[in-house]
Amino acid sequence: MIETDRLITPAPLSLKEEDLERALRPKHLAEYIGQEKIRGQLQIFIEAARRRREALDHVLLFGPPGLGKTTLAHIVAKEMGVGLRQTSGPVLERPGDLAALLTNLEPNDVLFIDEIHRLSPVVEEILYPALEDYQLDIMIGEGPAARSVKLDLPPFTLVGATTRAGMLTNPLRDRFGIISRLEFYSVEELTQIVMRSAALLGADISPDGATEIARRSRGTPRVVNRLLRRVRDFAEVKAEGRINRQVADAALLMLDVDAIGLDVMDRKLLLTVMEKFGGGPVGVDNLAAAISEERGTIEDVLEPYLIQQGYMKRTPRGRMATSIAYQHFGLALPRNGLSADLWDEKQ
């Protein structure tokens, strides 16, 4: 299965979905649900910057995909009352690409760079003086006649977003004054998001129906909104448009999303560890070959949620399924030496 085919992938599935996301996106911090600590901090920092009529300190947002990093970047610009320029690390291939963006910023504007960990080293070098001194060093000419010219930039705020904070270089990370990690959302928070999105979409949904969708959404707002749209389609055809717990359950089972939010790929990964490798430990390369997936897909897409929920763990010797995973699938715990710690965990 291709990652972009997964209903519960935290990545956007299409440009159309990105348009739908924008329609559901909160515009102000007061409308933003979840991430209370980050929201409270930003509220104070933004208000202080506005009172001083200064640019907000540079902001780094990191965490798994689909948790609202882009939404927060838009909210920062909206709350500051300034413009927003948006791009991504892979798009900025040459120093000139970044220079064109920076020289067109208005005072206190927000520049949002998604996937900032994928900036090329040569572009990153240009960014350092821009962040620290609001200056741009550019080379004019070539060879012996080349010379460096400094251009003054207006004060601005860089909002960087990344799913791989560990891949940022130390010099770049050190230039951010505000660094925040986004966490997975609780079922209660996701239920509020479902109710809000359903109202915007004109969907008729009960609180228990919203909770049923929320608890299968892997702690991710992007996933919960996607599941809501699919359940709405099911309800319009099968239940006269009314979404309750039974309708949501039937729709999600039809979509192959089980009671804890696992899909075919999740179940395949866990069952491979348990049935083919005796519960582990198994190296990630062997596991990738066994399920015909790329190593990066396992590490970046499949594992984070499974580990966070306690169904799998990383050890120095490889990946292991936990007793919780065995219980979920109704399988007996292995009694071999390799998985002895599963028995310790069970006890």
UniProtKB/Swiss-Prot annotation:
<feature type="binding site">
    <location>
        <position position="66"/>
    </location>
    <ligand>
        <name>ATP</name>
    </ligand>
</feature>
<keyword id="KW-0238">DNA-binding</keyword>
<feature type="binding site">
    <location>
        <position position="25"/>
    </location>
    <ligand>
        <name>ATP</name>
    </ligand>
</feature>
<feature type="binding site">
    <location>
        <position position="70"/>
    </location>
    <ligand>
        <name>ATP</name>
    </ligand>
</feature>
<keyword id="KW-0547">Nucleotide-binding</keyword>
<feature type="binding site">
    <location>
        <position position="69"/>
    </location>
    <ligand>
        <name>ATP</name>
    </ligand>
</feature>
<feature type="binding site">
    <location>
        <position position="175"/>
    </location>
    <ligand>
        <name>ATP</name>
    </ligand>
</feature>
<feature type="binding site">
    <location>
        <position position="222"/>
    </location>
    <ligand>
        <name>ATP</name>
    </ligand>
</feature>
<keyword id="KW-0227">DNA damage</keyword>
<feature type="binding site">
    <location>
        <position position="295"/>
    </location>
    <ligand>
        <name>DNA</name>
    </ligand>
</feature>
<protein>
    <recommendedName>
        <fullName>Holliday junction branch migration complex subunit RuvB</fullName>
        <ecNumber>3.6.4.-</ecNumber>
    </recommendedName>
</protein>
<feature type="region of interest" description="Large ATPase domain (RuvB-L)">
    <location>
        <begin position="4"/>
        <end position="185"/>
    </location>
</feature>
<keyword id="KW-0378">Hydrolase</keyword>
<feature type="binding site">
    <location>
        <begin position="132"/>
        <end position="134"/>
    </location>
    <ligand>
        <name>ATP</name>
    </ligand>
</feature>
<dbReference type="Pfam" id="PF17864">
    <property type="entry name" value="AAA_lid_4"/>
</dbReference>
<feature type="binding site">
    <location>
        <position position="314"/>
    </location>
    <ligand>
        <name>DNA</name>
    </ligand>
</feature>
<feature type="region of interest" description="Head domain (RuvB-H)">
    <location>
        <begin position="259"/>
        <end position="347"/>
    </location>
</feature>
<feature type="binding site">
    <location>
        <position position="24"/>
    </location>
    <ligand>
        <name>ATP</name>
    </ligand>
</feature>
<dbReference type="GO" id="GO:0000400">
    <property type="term" value="F:four-way junction DNA binding"/>
</dbReference>
<feature type="binding site">
    <location>
        <position position="71"/>
    </location>
    <ligand>
        <name>ATP</name>
    </ligand>
</feature>
<dbReference type="InterPro" id="IPR004605">
    <property type="entry name" value="DNA_helicase_Holl-junc_RuvB"/>
</dbReference>
<dbReference type="GO" id="GO:0016887">
    <property type="term" value="F:ATP hydrolysis activity"/>
</dbReference>
<dbReference type="InterPro" id="IPR036390">
    <property type="entry name" value="WH_DNA-bd_sf"/>
</dbReference>
<comment type="similarity">
    <text>Belongs to the RuvB family.</text>
</comment>
<dbReference type="GO" id="GO:0005524">
    <property type="term" value="F:ATP binding"/>
</dbReference>
<feature type="binding site">
    <location>
        <position position="319"/>
    </location>
    <ligand>
        <name>DNA</name>
    </ligand>
</feature>
<dbReference type="Pfam" id="PF05496">
    <property type="entry name" value="RuvB_N"/>
</dbReference>
<dbReference type="GO" id="GO:0048476">
    <property type="term" value="C:Holliday junction resolvase complex"/>
</dbReference>
<feature type="binding site">
    <location>
        <position position="185"/>
    </location>
    <ligand>
        <name>ATP</name>
    </ligand>
</feature>
<dbReference type="GO" id="GO:0009378">
    <property type="term" value="F:four-way junction helicase activity"/>
</dbReference>
<keyword id="KW-0233">DNA recombination</keyword>
<dbReference type="InterPro" id="IPR008824">
    <property type="entry name" value="RuvB-like_N"/>
</dbReference>
<dbReference type="InterPro" id="IPR036388">
    <property type="entry name" value="WH-like_DNA-bd_sf"/>
</dbReference>
<keyword id="KW-0234">DNA repair</keyword>
<dbReference type="Pfam" id="PF05491">
    <property type="entry name" value="RuvB_C"/>
</dbReference>
<keyword id="KW-0963">Cytoplasm</keyword>
<dbReference type="GO" id="GO:0006310">
    <property type="term" value="P:DNA recombination"/>
</dbReference>
<comment type="function">
    <text>The RuvA-RuvB-RuvC complex processes Holliday junction (HJ) DNA during genetic recombination and DNA repair, while the RuvA-RuvB complex plays an important role in the rescue of blocked DNA replication forks via replication fork reversal (RFR). RuvA specifically binds to HJ cruciform DNA, conferring on it an open structure. The RuvB hexamer acts as an ATP-dependent pump, pulling dsDNA into and through the RuvAB complex. RuvB forms 2 homohexamers on either side of HJ DNA bound by 1 or 2 RuvA tetramers; 4 subunits per hexamer contact DNA at a time.</text>
</comment>
<dbReference type="GO" id="GO:0005737">
    <property type="term" value="C:cytoplasm"/>
</dbReference>
<dbReference type="GO" id="GO:0006281">
    <property type="term" value="P:DNA repair"/>
</dbReference>
<feature type="region of interest" description="Small ATPAse domain (RuvB-S)">
    <location>
        <begin position="186"/>
        <end position="256"/>
    </location>
</feature>
<keyword id="KW-0067">ATP-binding</keyword>
